Amino acid sequence: MTQHLFMVGARGCGKTTVGQALARVLGYAFADTDDMLWRSTGKTVAEIVAKEGWTGFRARESEILTSVTQGNAVVATGGGIILSAANRRFMRARGTVVYLHATAQELSRRLRAYPEDDQRPSLTGKPMIEEIAEVLAAREKLYQEAAHHVLDASQPPDDVVSAILQQLYPSAAS
């Protein structure tokens, strides 16, 4: 049976880093919806948003999400994938959704350490910590609604992977 593990959470929470490590451990394929979007369009998230707006980007993001249907895979999603109720339903119906939760302070620290401005356009135009706190507050309920499992993403990636494995396979951990 095909099994998908969808990683959700705010930008900078570790969806790609943890997702890649988890895929290696499980022997699953790894997919990143932002990367898939770039490969299919030849444009970065910032370029798509500049040309089509957030609505156009979100529509493309949903198309990419539903195209991930073959084989066992860990899928790192964009931070806003949960804004669409259809995306939340799709992920829950097609696999297990893992919410990597981190505080605004931790996310800000990570984003400052590894800036990717061309990949991550501002959503509000506010200073980073304010924007992150505002976006988290607006999305927290949706992340929780989508998730089968919620994990603390402030730990090192290997620890987060171990915690995910313990949640997914509790009998193997004992």
Swiss-Prot record:
Keyword entries, A-Z: Amino-acid biosynthesis, Aromatic amino acid biosynthesis, ATP-binding, Cytoplasm, Kinase, Magnesium, Metal-binding, Nucleotide-binding, Transferase
Cofactor: Mg(2+)
Associated pathway: Metabolic intermediate biosynthesis; chorismate biosynthesis; chorismate from D-erythrose 4-phosphate and phosphoenolpyruvate: step 5/7
Function: Catalyzes the specific phosphorylation of the 3-hydroxyl group of shikimic acid using ATP as a cosubstrate.
Annotated protein name in UniProt: Shikimate kinase 2
UniProt cross-references to Pfam families, sorted A to Z: SKI
Organism: Sodalis glossinidius (strain morsitans)
Domain notes: The LID domain closes over the active site upon ATP binding.
Presence of keyword Magnesium: yes
PROSITE patterns reported for this sequence: SHIKIMATE_KINASE
Record-level Gene Ontology MF annotations: ATP binding; magnesium ion binding; shikimate kinase activity
Catalytic activity: shikimate + ATP = 3-phosphoshikimate + ADP + H(+)
